Structures are given as structure tokens and as C-alpha cells.
């Protein structure tokens, strides 16, 4: 395993380890990997995860792209999945 950035949840006891190609989530009951997203239309190429942050009560993961702007995905802290369409970061 390579070095990762560590991010702790505000809502529960989840700890997120951010790697280039995945986010590994550790909670009291489960360890789960969230893989780097893939665009089924191949319009956008996602290169790597960068960091995580809160905006209000929502948790986001930022992904580097080959486009002009990186994208952010909302993270569902209950299902431990990326949800919704990606949002451009400017």
C-alpha cells in the first residue's frame, strides 16, 4: 500500500484513506473501497483522487481529470458510494 491522505468523518466514525486510484473507508463494522469512477460514455477521463472536503453537511471527493477542471463527487456516508453527477471545480 502506498501513502495516503487521511480524512475523518464529521457524521460518524468513518476514516477515509485517499489514494490515487481508490478511497479506503474504515468504520467500526466494515472496510470498503470506493474505486476511481469510470465515465461509461468515455467523455471524461478520471485520472486520480486528490482530496476530500465538507461543504455544509455534504462530503465530497475531488478527482483529477484530463479536462480543464477537476470534478467533485458527493460521497454518501451511509452507503459509502459516490453519488450524483460530478460537479466541476473552478
Question: What do the predicted segments below correspond to?
Answer:
Residues 1-13, 38-56, 85-90:
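Repeated scaffold domains used in trafficking and secretory/extracellular systems
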Residues 29, 34, 42-71:
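Acidic, low-complexity, intrinsically disordered interaction modules
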Amino acid at each position: 500500500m502506498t501513502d495516503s491522505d487521511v480524512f475523518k468523518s464529521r457524521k460518524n466514525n468513518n476514516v477515509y484513506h485517499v489514494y490515487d486510484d481508490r478511497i479506503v473507508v474504515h468504520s467500526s463494522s466494515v472496510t470498503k473501497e470506493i474505486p476511481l469512477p469510470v465515465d461509461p460514455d468515455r467523455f471524461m477521463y478520471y485520472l486520480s483522487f486528490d482530496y476530500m472536503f465538507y461543504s455544509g453537511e455534504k462530503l465530497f471527493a475531488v478527482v483529477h481529470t484530463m479536462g480543464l477542471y477537476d470534478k467533485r463527487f458527493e460521497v454518501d456516508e451511509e452507503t459509502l458510494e459516490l453519488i450524483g453527477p460530478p460537479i466541476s471545480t473552478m
